[in-house]
């Protein structure tokens, strides 16, 4: 997994893959859009949004 731009449905799909059964806390206010869509984010950064 290399750092990627993830926006919209791609971002949600990536969170489902990374978090699995834990689920995730998704809110645009958390900065995930800025981190992963405007810039790039890593698998490790995505894991920060898992429950």
Curated annotation (Swiss-Prot):
It comes from Balaenoptera borealis (Sei whale). GO terms for cellular component: extracellular space. Belongs to the insulin family. PANTHER family: INSULIN, INSULIN/INSULIN GROWTH FACTOR. Heterodimer of a B chain and an A chain linked by two disulfide bonds. Disulfide bonds join 7-37, 19-50, 36-41. It comes from the Eukaryota. One of its GO terms (biological process) is glucose homeostasis. This is Insulin. GO terms for molecular function: hormone activity. SUPFAM superfamilies: Insulin-like. It is found in: Secreted. Insulin decreases blood glucose concentration. It increases cell permeability to monosaccharides, amino acids and fatty acids. It accelerates glycolysis, the pentose phosphate cycle, and glycogen synthesis in liver. InterPro entries: Insulin (IPR004825), Insulin-like (IPR016179), Insulin-like_sf (IPR036438), Insulin_CS (IPR022353), Insulin_family (IPR022352). Keywords: Carbohydrate metabolism, Disulfide bond, Glucose metabolism, Hormone, Secreted. Pfam families: Insulin. The gene is INS.
